[in-house]
């Protein structure tokens, strides 16, 4: 056999061996937000078990800025070898592409979906100062007072802005948006009655609801949430088909080899089947909701136009 053929075979075997050995070094998970937030909690919960499955350390790296865009760019430019992943939320994956006209990345163009890991429903809240007890009460109350009811959000273009816009579209209500710099000041004004309505993630909403500081009227998931078991879903409350939830997922740079993607996706599946992980995830306010690489890609393709419509309806732009 000619020497050049032997060399080609040797190189092919070396390449196959390299892929088969993945991973051989620590894996970096980039988060486009500061430490201490919900994504950080989610990353650390999964990293603890993921490194046991893969046999390599999982290092969480924070690259915050521009609504997650800085972190996304960092991962997009990384080698497509499976050693750099991004943990992203709804905003980074499907809201930002509609919010920024000059966004430096396209989610399905510049990234390879690895796994969806969680869904995060929200609660629809009102100030206790309003004389309403149910979502139907609130809808009727607001319809009788067009333009007199304000809703607060953590800022323009975020999920706490867009979910109320979806609610407005579904009900035909006219409410005025009051954006804040984060959810904390918005909650303060909701408690005080300066704004009357808000959509917020379950953990914080449940805590304030149980203290009587706000009143939860409905949750936005298809099923009731364990943290608010007595609160009906929006669908139960008469809003047919109103299921709006945020989600978390892991992505790699576009061009990551299929066998590496499969190894990572399978590892996440094993971790997500761990009862301890699922229980702790629920305690953090997220619903375990695994999708493998292909299904996650289809999910993102379906969610993108939905959120794009909400952004357009809101009029939000962040260029």
Feature roles, as predicted:
Residues 77-83, 90, 98-185, 234-236, ...:
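Hinge/capping helix and adjacent helix->loop/strand transition within the periplasmic-binding protein
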Residues 24-26, 171, 210, 258-319:
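An extracytoplasmic/periplasmic, membrane-proximal ligand-sensing/linker region
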Residues 82-86, 123, 196-197, 215-216, ...:
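Short, Asp-centered acidic motifs that coordinate Mg2+ and/or phosphate
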Residues 1-9:
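Bacterial N-terminal signal peptides that target proteins for export
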Residues 204-273, 302-305:
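C-terminal lobe and pocket-closing loops
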Residues 20-109, 147-150, 156, 172-201, ...:
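N-terminal (or domain-start) structured segment
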Residues 8-17:
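Bacterial N-terminal signal peptides
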